[in-house]
Every structure is written in structure tokens, then in C-alpha cells.
Amino acid sequence: RREAVADLFGRATPAEQKWLQAVVTGNLRQGALDAVTQEAVAQVAEVPLAAVRRAAMLAGSTVAAAGAAFAGEEALAAIGLEVGRPVMPMLASSAPDVATAMAGLSPDGATEVAIDTKLDGIRIQVHREGDDVLVVTRSLDDITGRLPEVVEVARSLPAERFVLDGEALALTDDGRPMAFQDTASRTAQDESREGQRAITPHFFDLLHVDGRDLLDSPGHERLAALDALVPEQHRVRRLVTA
């Protein structure tokens, strides 16, 4: 295997070597290429693609999933959600219009559909283990130290261990979202917070709470658990069809 990798790098151009290095080290910041890599791993390791994608999501790394894939499907299945280890975010799919989206979610028209308000903020994932809190971005960058308000909210919630998914944004005095640039500036490296608006977290999903994984639970159970943990002012507004 080492010889094959060495041969691959030897035949690659400098630009291709840089890309390959990013794949190997887990620093590839391109979701589409990450998906292609997962497909290649599944094919070469002869394991289900769905198992590779789930393991990569839970491990927060395609590289970690690839290592497990070559050990077999059981090794992939052994990778689970861990509080304190960032999870690759699940991204929404697009639809041309509301009717098409509703038809896809509820073909018979009888299934309840939860519709969240779209917030133009920064995607955040919040992990809490006792007093320890971790806040990461959509790209899994650690921004805990830059968002003390989010840490404070997390510590105020009535649970010791949880993983929340949500959005963080700056609000005006009357509670309206400010421009995305105002929110984004708060996560910039070495950016001073002096004179800037406070950031408010709004959560729309709960992945784990006090030893209970909710990833595979029905949507209504996850939302009920979210509502029980997070007060209304820190939840994304939601409409559920009848």
C-alpha cells in the first residue's frame, strides 16, 4: 500500500500532490471532492457507500472513515457519535418551489412536515460535557473562544451532555437579524469584540442529550427533546403542518 501511494505521488504534478496531501491529512476543504473521495473509498474497500458516509459524518473526517473502511463494515459501524468530537453537518437539499419540496417530504399529504425559519447567520454545532463547551463552525473550525455568549447559553441549559445544531447571528435592538457580515466578523481570527453586537444562538436540532443519541430517532422525537432542553428564545421558529 505504501508503494502504491508513493507511486501515485510520484506520477502526480505539484498541484495534484498538494490536493492528494490534503486528502490524506484531512485538510481538504471542498465538500464535493470529499464526497468523491468517500465514493472511491467505498468502491476500493468494497463496503457500502452509506456506511462510509455515516462514519465520516460521525468521525468528522473522511480520513478516519477510510481507515475504518479497510478494516471492514463492522469497523465503520463502530464509529459513533461522541460528545466533544465535531460531526460533519447535514446539509439541506434544494427544491424549485415549496410545492415540490412538500411533495417530496409528504407524498400522501398526510405526513407532518416541520418548516424552520431560514436564518442568515453562521452555522454552529455546540457540544457540552459538564462545564466544558465546544463551539464549531460548518467547516468544524473551533470558535469557542470567540463566542462566549454561546458558551454561556450552553452552560445554562438543564443537561450535562448534549450536541446541538443551530445558527448564531447578531440582532438589532428590536430583535431583527443584522447583515450576515456583522455576524461573520465576530468569528474572524483575532477580531476585537469591542463595539460589536452580541451573538445569539438559535438551535434547530438536538443530536444527543445525556447519554441518548437522537440521530436515528424520528423527527418529532428529536424536536420534542429539543423543545424540552432549549428555551423558546434560543430555538429557530418552526411551523408544523397539520
What is the predicted function of each stretch?
Residues R1-T200, L206-T241:
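N-terminal nucleic-acid-engaging modules of covalent nucleotidyltransferase systems
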